[in-house]
Swiss-Prot record:
Alphabetized GO MF terms: dihydroorotate dehydrogenase (quinone) activity
GO biological process, alphabetically ordered: 'de novo' pyrimidine nucleobase biosynthetic process; 'de novo' UMP biosynthetic process
Subunit structure: Monomer.
Gene Ontology terms: cellular component: cytoplasm; plasma membrane
Membrane topology field: Peripheral membrane protein
Protein name per its UniProtKB record: Dihydroorotate dehydrogenase (quinone)
Organism of origin: Vibrio vulnificus (strain CMCP6)
InterPro entries in the cross-refs: Aldolase_TIM, DHO_dehydrogenase, Dihydroorotate_DH_1_2, Dihydroorotate_DH_2, Dihydroorotate_DH_cat, Dihydroorotate_DH_CS
Biochemical pathway: Pyrimidine metabolism; UMP biosynthesis via de novo pathway; orotate from (S)-dihydroorotate (quinone route): step 1/1
Pfam families referenced in this protein's UniProt entry, alphabetically: DHO_dh
Record keywords: Cell membrane, Flavoprotein, FMN, Membrane, Oxidoreductase, Pyrimidine biosynthesis
Subcellular location: Cell membrane
The encoding gene: pyrD
Length: 336
């Protein structure tokens, strides 16, 4: 009820202004009596995945807390894990505004943010100050002005800087809002990137005395053959996990709706069916050898269960959290 009232107010604002205000409020109120409005004690539902122990299988997807400013707030809400970022080596402002749109009737969101963030060094400073007990994932990407043929260098820079502080590292090669980025999902380009990442992972494991798993985040807009090829690359390069999926460019589910033709990636309920199908295809190809984090339209216990029945070991929420608030986390965890 409280969240519904808060949402009504936030939804009167421009979508990005509402997002920024929410982040500011979480920063301001966490650790004060006001955080009782969103602090939750949830039952333990431990899951072993990628060599880590998650207190429950429900995580916050990347994109909501790009700079790691609100880790303590999301930890207080009971998430089993929180994925911050996407972060790039250098700060960048992202694409021109407006760049974030609600499709309220479909419980969807379209964004063309373009990896706006304050840079990896800023994120690390925020992580170092935060106190939390959930698993922390850090999602890394490349700067827009880095040529795609030099993209691996950006991932390696970020990886080196976040390794010590991350529970796992998510490698984002599937955002539709950075020109050319999705080409890294295919063939030799993918294999070359994964070889470099695994080499760096081994080097950093020796340096820091701990193994930090790598998870690759993929797009929903892939053919069955492309998914099969990605799976072969994941297996061949011993990647620790796969996150399925990022946002979609497909507008079939929202045709005719206000904002439906805005450029960018569509998330939320309209993505639910396709992302679950990708999870199913991954499970069939990977045969349980590589864990799957399912994301895309997880807006209820039923949707979370569908992802897990399709083969997801963990699930993440983003748009569903915007529409339903912290109660969504509670409902999923309690009913699993």
């Amino acid at each position: 009820m409280l969240y519904r009232l808060a949402r009504a107010g936030f939804f009167q604002l421009d979508a990005e202004k509402a997002h920024d205000l929410a982040i500011q409020n979480f920063k301001r109120f966490t650790g004060t009596p006001i955080d009782l409005f969103y602090r939750q004690q949830l039952p333990n539902r431990p899951v072993e995945c990628m060599g880590l122990t998650f207190r429950n299988p429900v995580g916050l997807a990347a994109g909501l807390d790009k700079n790691g400013e609100c880790i303590e707030a999301f930890d207080a809400m009971g998430f089993g894990f929180v994925e911050v970022g996407t972060v790039t080596p250098r700060a960048q402002s992202g694409n021109d505004k407006p760049r974030l749109f609600r499709l309220v009737g479909a419980e969807g969101i379209i964004n063309r943010m373009g990896f706006n963030n304050l840079g990896v060094d800023n994120l690390i400073e925020n992580v170092k100050k935060a106190k939390y007990s959930c698993v922390l994932g850090i999602n890394i990407g490349k700067n827009k002005d880095t040529p795609i043929e030099k993209g691996a260098e950006d991932y390696l820079i970020c990886m080196e800087k976040v390794y010590e502080y991350a529970g796992y590292i998510a490698v984002n090669i599937s955002s539709p809002n950075t020109p050319g980025l999705r080409t890294l999902q295919y063939g030799e380009a993918l294999d070359e990137l994964l070889v470099e990442l695994k080499r760096k992972q081994a080097e950093l494991e020796e340096k820091h005395g701990k193994y930090v798993p790598l998870a690759l985040k993929i797009a929903p807009d892939l053919t069955d053959d492309e998914i099969s090829q990605i799976c072969q690359s994941l297996i061949n390069n011993k990647i620790d996990g796969v996150i399925a999926t990022n946002t979609t460019l497909d507008r079939t589910m929202v045709e005719g709706m206000k904002h439906a033709q805005e450029a960018g990636g569509l998330s939320g309920r309209p993505l639910q069916s396709r992302s679950t199908e990708v999870v199913r295809l991954l499970r069939k190809e990977l045969q349980g050898n590589i864990p799957i984090i399912g994301v895309g339209g997880v807006d209820s216990y039923v949707a979370a269960k569908e992802k897990m029945l399709a083969g997801a070991d963990l699930v993440q929420v983003y748009s569903g959290f915007i529409y339903h608030g912290p109660g969504l986390v509670r409902d999923i965890v309690k009913n699993l």
